[in-house]
Amino acid sequence: MDNNHKGPNDPNSKKPLLQNPLLLIAIFGIIIFVAMRVMNSDEGFGDRFLSTSTKNISYHEMKELIEKKEVDSVSIGQTLIKAISKEGNNKTIYVAKRVPDLSLVPLLDSQKINYSGFSESNFFADILGWLLPVLVILGLWMFMASRMQKNMGGGIFGMGSSKKLINAEKPKVRFNDMAGNEEAKEEVVEIVDFLKYPDRYASLGAKIPKGVLLVGPPGTGKTLLAKAVAGEASVPFFSMGGSSFIEMFVGLGASRVRDLFDIAKKEAPSIIFIDEIDAIGKSRAAGGMISGNDEREQTLNQLLAEMDGFGSENAPVIVLAATNRPEILDPALLRPGRFDRQVLVDKPDFKGRVEILKVHIKPVKLANDVDLQEIAKLTAGLAGADLANIINEAALLAGRNNQKEVKQQHLKEAVERGIAGLEKKSRRISPKEKKIVAYHESGHAVISEMTKGSARVNKVSIIPRGMAALGYTLNTPEENKYLMQKHELIAEIDVLLGGRAAEDVFLQEISTGASNDLERATDIIKGMVSYYGMSDVSGLMVLEKQRNSFLGGGFGSGREFSEKMAEEMDSFIKNLLEERYVHVKQTLSDYKDAIEVMVNELFEKEVITGERVREIISEYEVSHNLQTRLVPLEEHAS
């Protein structure tokens, strides 16, 4: 690359005069000023080139000139009277202040002198009324143009100069700095070998992969993994977001793709990383493009051409891209020869969460009571970024409380903040509402502990959290769930209905607190019918397509079944909800006294642990000589 080249935004490079906004504004201002002065005068353009002089006289002298016929014409304004003399080319303009005089016009008529009226203009009013708005609009236009020029790396006529905005970095991240994605790391380890020893593979006739697509949910470490590959291989790392290629002008995105690959080739071996590639790689068959000249489509076509065009045998350039929406990418982008491999960077399992917590806990001063395995059990389903945030939040909590070490209680509080939201201690609720919340959460807890396939209870609280929750039951599974059996889905429905059922059984009146529970229960049954084939309504037929597994998009937006099928689906959902609701109410009725004890303790302490919930249920069963219905740990969802 030519390091001596100065781009248009180089502070040491001189701008042409006509590109200076202030100079252009001044020029336009002078032109407008001259034009307005000419237009507002009572003389023509021809009179400007004659030799004229102006003389101020009294009104009496003006009348004498008119009476002696020494003026050729008279112009009458609101406050002034102007008269032009008859002295050939050397004319004199006489100006007098007008006074109320009804005899002036008859005098002009009697002397047969031409007269007319003229409007007197105020120069400063003209400036404010005409010149100032024009200059303001012009200034705004020049400001926007200069900003656009900077963003586009040189303006409309300087697309190629965006090269100077593309800088290589040498990441210091290594695979040891990552945890919880061992399978993903194994998939990309050989990419490091390709970059370090390209001749070894070329001598065997092997073709080095041109592209690797990293897919997975948000926050799982896709960007970090790409940097680790470059760090391990010690090669230049060129990173751009997919949206950085798209601009207002068609062709600019394609130009940036060319610039990016040109620079990467000169620095080869190197890595190009495109984050959120779905911004430019959306499928052209999905109806997302406006026309064949759409900016996104041109950018995608250029990317496809570049990945086809560069050779990688001697000087490899490998493209890494990240997305959490692989299902919308263009098939041409995913074919062999472009993105040869897809690597899943998924949420960590229990072991992975422990390792991630260990990585992020290194700079934190810990108390002796910290148990990372317990925290890992409470954080099933969270991504690496969530775990890093929990560690940081725990450190902030300890500092806020003037503690010298981070304790287990700080980590647990940080987990609850991440799952349920910020604790609202200042939110005051009435005793009546507090009672409703206590019964509601107790219902969730009891059904969760007595239903096979549900998650165990870790904590029950009636302290408001987040934007809307007045209480919550924390019952996270110890491990991620990749499959769910039908009885586990039914168990989840029962737990969700436990809150509403408890209100119904103990208070004989229901509230709006169960709205989200009912919505989630309905969605589960809808999925059983339309997607999982777990009902007699549609049998094994899939009625709706799942949208996006990584972003939690739910089920398809378009309905692909008949009105009759829709009616049968609605009937099935309603009947199953009613059936499970009756079952849950009966279970709660059987354990009325246990729930009353739980509610009283919640009123007193506001928080009880999962162990205490199980103790209350066991004590009730022993005192009433009942066979235990508590579900053993191994039969809970884990």
Curated annotation (Swiss-Prot):
Required cofactor(s): Zn(2+)
SMART domains documented for this protein: AAA (SM00382)
Residue stretches spanning the membrane: 16-36, 123-143
GO biological-process terms attached to the record: protein catabolic process; proteolysis
Segments in the Periplasmic topological domain: 37-122
GO MF, one example: metalloendopeptidase activity
Positions on the Cytoplasmic side per record topology: 1-15, 144-638
Its EC number(s): 3.4.24.-
Binding site for ATP: G216, P217, P218, G219, T220, G221, K222, T223
Residues at the catalytic site: E441
Binding site for Zn(2+): H440, H444, D517
Membrane topology label: Multi-pass membrane protein
Keywords: ATP-binding, Cell inner membrane, Cell membrane, Hydrolase, Membrane, Metal-binding, Metalloprotease, Nucleotide-binding, Protease, Transmembrane, Transmembrane helix, Zinc
Broad class of the protein's primary localization: membrane
UniProt subcellular location: Cell inner membrane
GO cellular component terms listed in the entry, alphabetical order: plasma membrane
Family assignment from sequence similarity: In the central section; belongs to the AAA ATPase family.
Assembly with partners or alone: Homohexamer.
Purpose: Acts as a processive, ATP-dependent zinc metallopeptidase for both cytoplasmic and membrane proteins. Plays a role in the quality control of integral membrane proteins.
Protein's name in the database: ATP-dependent zinc metalloprotease FtsH
Phylogenetic placement of the source organism: Bacteria, Pseudomonadati, Campylobacterota, Epsilonproteobacteria, Campylobacterales
